[in-house]
């Protein structure tokens, strides 16, 4: 493990331990604290371990200097699934702690999160009723699973996100994200959101305008006069694609291995937290590339 990753994990542990302390459990305190648990989960995502058993074998062999106590797989899995609210709070806390948080420009997009392939796995999955069949136009393929709807800044810093049934309209999810946390938009006067053609809807435009938000997306050729800034969309849209590529190509989002609602949720959040942590730390140390994981992934 490199000294760069060692420094990042130490900074993350201190941040969580100082700012996100959870109420103490009844009885004997856990031997692995919540801050250590989240830090261990981030290290797993950055180093690319999909299998928790293999990850814990590696941790027992190489990370005892950072983590005096390391649990076995059942205890780690149980604690990690229960820590989903803490992981979400950590994502938000790190994002707020950067100078990118109040950026008046957001980019929104969705990407599939496959959860099963075989018909038998779909039939027996605990995700039935939450996951569903969907179609990914960019890859021209059907999948069974969920969709990750991510709202981020141009630098890739996650602002808010949601996992949803792939059959749910993207416009409904965006409206729900804004409606669920209206303060995110109200604290950014003149907020502009960039999106693709999937977000075209007069109803969505009216809803966002009521929250003081403007939406810029490509217009259809036969519908009205295009926005003067539309030629810039193609360049800016590549940013969100690169964010999705970071999550899938470097943090292995589609190899999450989750089989339950909590399991999928925390493993997706684990990867978003790892990316957020890298952005946060790179801004602190003045790294030339904000979203680079190269210094930490080996």
PLM features per residue range, with description:
Residues 1-298:
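Short alpha-helical elements
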